[in-house]
Design a protein with these regions (language model features):
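Conserved ABC ATPase "signature" region
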Residues: 73, 77, 82-97
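Conserved ABC transporter NBD signature motif
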Residues: 33-41, 48-49
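Conserved ABC ATPase signature
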Residues: 101-105
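ABC ATPase "signature
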Residues: 185-186
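Conserved catalytic motifs of ABC-family nucleotide-binding domains
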Residues: 122
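Catalytic Walker B motif of ABC-type/P-loop ATPase nucleotide-binding domains
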Residues: 126-130
Length: 226
């Protein structure tokens, strides 16, 4: 994985995506191989790796009765890292929800907040495990914009997803895994071009738009995810 890119891990269920992520995140012991994160060897100094990464919590990892400000203060204390909560919330367009309770957030807002918490310790790398699962099309695209903005500020993003359109639109490079092994590693465009060059064909789609485009055109507003 290269510094400053959005890197996607793709594969069917059971391929090893989440296991690979958990090993790199120091949450699971590896059985073989070597893991180097920003020049740090996982075997010799996992503590240093923990200091430079941010891991997205699932929605069940937050206290529902606390406000967003209270949750940020909690995580800031755990990391022993002072943070301007309003600036952090502004980054994910939740500044107006600062004093709202977590349980009052919509699905898209909860996902954006969970990404915000990965940035509290100012990490070099963040890990997002299927961050758009369950979101409507507009909320998904808004989250893509957020992930790109984080990448553009210099943070490396590692993401797993089952949505191939998401990987194609969002990722600079992807690794396709199957049965615990990487079977392809390249940019989405290069993988597609190689497949076409091999003689692959499918019926051409003649319409210039699809139902998702209609949905977003009719309902879409910036960060509309209620």
């Amino acid at each position: 994985m290269k510094e400053g890119e959005i890197f996607g891990l793709l594969g069917p269920n059971g391929a090893g995506k989440s296991t690979t992520m958990e090993i790199i995140e120091t949450l699971r012991k590896k059985t073989s191989g070597k893991v180097i994160v920003d020049g740090i060897d996982l075997d010799t100094d996992p503590g240093k790796i923990k200091k430079i990464i941010g891991v997205q919590l699932q929605t069940s990892g937050f206290y529902p009765g606390l406000t967003l400000l209270e949750l940020i203060a909690l995580f800031s204390g755990l990391y022993n890292q002072p943070v301007n909560a309003y600036e952090l919330l502004e980054l994910v367009n939740l500044q107006e929800k600062a004093k709202s309770k977590y349980k009052e957030m919509s699905g898209g807002q909860k996902q954006r907040f969970s990404i915000a918490t990965t940035l509290i310790n100012k990490p070099k790398i963040i890990f997002l495990d299927e961050p758009t699962t369950g979101l409507d099309p507009q909320a998904r695209r808004n989250l893509w914009d957020l992930v790109r903005s984080i990448r553009d500020k210099g943070t490396t993003v590692i993401i797993t997803t089952h949505y191939m359109d998401e990987a194609e639109q969002l990722c600079d490079r992807v690794a396709i895994m199957d049965e615990g092994k990487i079977i392809a590693l390249q940019t989405p465009d290069k993988l597609i071009d190689d497949l076409v060059a091999s003689g692959f064909e499918k019926p051409k789609i003649t319409k210039a738009a699809n139902l998702e485009d209609v949905f977003i055109q009719l309902t879409g507003k910036d960060f509309k995810d209620d």
